[in-house]
Amino acid sequence: MRLLRRRHMPLRLAMVGCAFVLFLFLLHRDVSSREEATEKPWLKSLVSRKDHVLDLMLEAMNNLRDSMPKLQIRAPEAQQTLFSINQSCLPGFYTPAELKPFWERPPQDPNAPGADGKAFQKSKWTPLETQEKEEGYKKHCFNAFASDRISLQRSLGPDTRPPECVDQKFRRCPPLATTSVIIVFHNEAWSTLLRTVYSVLHTTPAILLKEIILVDDASTEEHLKEKLEQYVKQLQVVRVVRQEERKGLITARLLGASVAQAEVLTFLDAHCECFHGWLEPLLARIAEDKTVVVSPDIVTIDLNTFEFAKPVQRGRVHSRGNFDWSLTFGWETLPPHEKQRRKDETYPIKSPTFAGGLFSISKSYFEHIGTYDNQMEIWGGENVEMSFRVWQCGGQLEIIPCSVVGHVFRTKSPHTFPKGTSVIARNQVRLAEVWMDSYKKIFYRRNLQAAKMAQEKSFGDISERLQLREQLHCHNFSWYLHNVYPEMFVPDLTPTFYGAIKNLGTNQCLDVGENNRGGKPLIMYSCHGLGGNQYFEYTTQRDLRHNIAKQLCLHVSKGALGLGSCHFTGKNSQVPKDEEWELAQDQLIRNSGSGTCLTSQDKKPAMAPCNPSDPHQLWLFV
């Protein structure tokens, strides 16, 4: 049978050839025929018949073509990709010689103050030294005396990262992009600012470092003016740009980004030190996916001794970014599913939010995603806003554990803010109105200042940001909670009661006291109407929550009133009787487990046998 098919093959080819020649002849004649048909109506029917014949012939030719043996497999069609692949890059991996730092460190004295990242130590102080130290703390909120005596180019000792980080190789294709390092400062100490700069120069491969841009947010200190300009000229790739008016971190970073020339923007604070191999893992992840915003593993530089908390070879317990319903950024340990997903320290950590001080991002993606909200003022809320925006609009936030950068964490800011701290509330309202949908109500219940701004619409024009959300086809906030941060407890959108709990006997309000994260006694305090320590919710599950940040519940244990972590978490959980409360019409607040009622007798909240005639047991949500 196969032999017979092969013998007939030439005949089929000849038939196809003849049919094709006849088709060309008729097609040539067709042009003149159509022109004549328009003038001679009697020819129209013949032309239409010829069209039908041509259709039949074409169909026959297609059938013959399809019935012929497939002698050659076609090459697969090229698939479109989101980003073009660089065809000029070399195969293999970057060598240590290629990743040589921009500058080699000068010889180090191992006995120098703070050498190898060790703590600054001093046992004897003169009166002048003590005065200098105290003035440094007052001015910078860290030990500037110690910083000033540590080398600007100090080494941090050997590379102590886990072996998989030290041995990590980076592919040449796609190539690692160049980066512009942007450092914003305002009246920063000379030593911490310059140590940050030198740290970048000594740890960053020359082929990857395009420039270091120092953005001055209207500093008033003389050493940060002409002296700084002259000093950085010797550093080749360092330049200073300035905001003449104090506009804050957000605007300053936008200024730095606008003049940056590299493919990737890397933002650092002005009191950092970079560890071995900090940049390459960040750039490698962006080379894999330009929609990923990556942060280093941020470790502590002690604000008193400037000791650098070095990574350890066995790895450490990692944290990721979170937020609470007052829209404050925080840290939390990794959930089990994230620990299981990561095989070793080279695997990135998915993070619902990021600190926002230290990160790298593709410049083109930064612009695509909407940079920063340029109507936000000074500082505050911009990191949470960007976190929501990146995730909801198709990007990702990741922490790269093999990238380690130290940061001086201060307990308070040494700087004053134009317009006061109300700018933070205004920034938070802007992010809530654009990204949080109906969940913004949860925030407004906890921040009455923000709620008032929202009601009065005194937070500026957000039309451009809403248009950006629409243009990028971003997900809603419910999607974010379900897919990015399912561990987040979502309070009732409409709790049964909320606000301050006022006692009719004392005219004071129930208050959790300062810094009560659970375990401390509650107090009675003058009602201030600002929420905060006096904010409570009576939920549909019948628990009484103080949940500005942590979810804390009132409970009764051994007859005593207490405040602790809530047992109801929304999934496969229930409210225990000692946390369940009944708000009766007689204004008593009765605990279901003990059967006793909340009282303010002796101006201290406690439990007592229920007595509706006692005004100290009568409460009202206000």
Curated annotation (Swiss-Prot):
Report the SS bond pairs.
C165-C402, C393-C474, C509-C527, C553-C566, C597-C610
> Where in the cell?
Golgi apparatus membrane
Q: PROSITE patterns, alphabetically?
A: RICIN_B_LECTIN
Q: Name one Pfam family in it.
A: Ricin_B_lectin
Catalyzed reactions: L-seryl-[protein] + UDP-N-acetyl-alpha-D-galactosamine = a 3-O-[N-acetyl-alpha-D-galactosaminyl]-L-seryl-[protein] + UDP + H(+); L-threonyl-[protein] + UDP-N-acetyl-alpha-D-galactosamine = a 3-O-[N-acetyl-alpha-D-galactosaminyl]-L-threonyl-[protein] + UDP + H(+)
Q: In which tissues is it expressed?
A: Expressed in placenta and trachea. Weakly expressed in brain and pancreas. Expressed in fibroblast. Weakly or not expressed in lung, liver, muscle, kidney, spleen, thymus, prostate, testis, ovary, intestine, colon, leukocyte, stomach, thyroid, spinal cord, lymph node, trachea, adrenal gland and bone marrow.
Q: Which InterPro entries match?
A: GalNAc-T, Glyco_trans_2-like, Nucleotide-diphossugar_trans, Ricin_B-like_lectins, Ricin_B_lectin
Residues in compartment: Lumenal: 29-622
List the GO biological process terms: O-glycan processing; protein O-linked glycosylation; protein O-linked glycosylation via threonine
Q: By its UniProt entry, which SUPFAM superfamilies does this protein fall under? A: Nucleotide-diphospho-sugar transferases, Ricin B-like lectins
GO annotations of cellular component type: Golgi apparatus; Golgi membrane; perinuclear region of cytoplasm
- Which Gene3D superfamilies does the entry link to? 2.80.10.50, Spore Coat Polysaccharide Biosynthesis Protein SpsA, Chain A (3.90.550.10)
Domain comment quoted from the record: There are two conserved domains in the glycosyltransferase region: the N-terminal domain (domain A, also called GT1 motif), which is probably involved in manganese coordination and substrate binding and the C-terminal domain (domain B, also called Gal/GalNAc-T motif), which is probably involved in catalytic reaction and UDP-Gal binding. The ricin B-type lectin domain binds to GalNAc and contributes to the glycopeptide specificity.
Family to which the UniProt record says this protein belongs: Belongs to the glycosyltransferase 2 family. GalNAc-T subfamily.
- What role is this protein assigned? Catalyzes the initial reaction in O-linked oligosaccharide biosynthesis, the transfer of an N-acetyl-D-galactosamine residue to a serine or threonine residue on the protein receptor. May participate in synthesis of oncofetal fibronectin. Has activity toward MUC1A, MUC2, EA2 and fibronectin peptides. Glycosylates FGF23.
Q: Under what name is this protein listed?
A: Polypeptide N-acetylgalactosaminyltransferase 6
- Species whose genome carries this gene: Homo sapiens
